[in-house]
Amino acid sequence: IRRQREAAARIEAAFVDTARTIHNVEKNLLTNPTETVEQASRLVGQIVDSFLTAPDLALHVMSDKIGSEEMYFHSLNVTMLSLMVARDLKLPGEVVQCLGMGALFHDVGCRKVPDKIRLKTEPWTQAERNFYELHCEYGAEIGRELKFAPLALDVIEQHHEMFDGSGYPRQLRGEAIPLSARIFAVADVFDALSSRRPYKEPLPFDKVMAILHEGRGSHFDPSVLDTFTRLAPTLYAQLQGLDEASTRALLTDMVQRHFDVLV
């Protein structure tokens, strides 16, 4: 039992440690690019190898951080959510790794958007919105300079495309949008709605899912959204109203179920 509890604690600690690592990765990306990209690639591999062997546990640990004011958790949240969908769809390992890298650095182009636009709490002017929307192309330029794989660049450049062709930057439609970007789009909006931002409180889970389904077939690929919907709600329902001791017991049970070597 002690080993099981220690394993659960390690997984919880790993989430926080990984988020802190992402903070450092983003900070060092342009000043020390080669080493930073290698570090990020190893980080994605660790997420794939460790977190995704226990998707329920990972989703719980992540959900406990939703609403955090530490915005670098967003990159990890959307990476994990995207990889969970990819895992369920049984995508090849190379695709999953590239999806993770693209998700981790999806907003790298925002560093070229002035803070007065990016952090503005009032509605943007049309000129400000047009400038902000350039972050996808800026990000792809940075990714190409850093020699990101094409599949990772797909996520960075196309994550704001919409299934009906009304997104940006290229107004791609349907399956012309890379699958990795279609997966990421659902994860990105889910986390944005679920998280506390300077201008809003997090929405309840049921409300978030209702908003996502309003975009089924317009904003989101229906099949990807259906997969995400199947993966997301069960654990959240389990966790409602649990106190600290009950949550710890649930975590331990998940470790027992998903890490057979410990049982």
Which positions does each model-derived feature cover?
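Histidine- and acidic-residue-rich, metal-dependent catalytic cores
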Residues: 10-263
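Extended, charge-enriched "interface" segments that sit outside catalytic cores
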Residues: 1-13
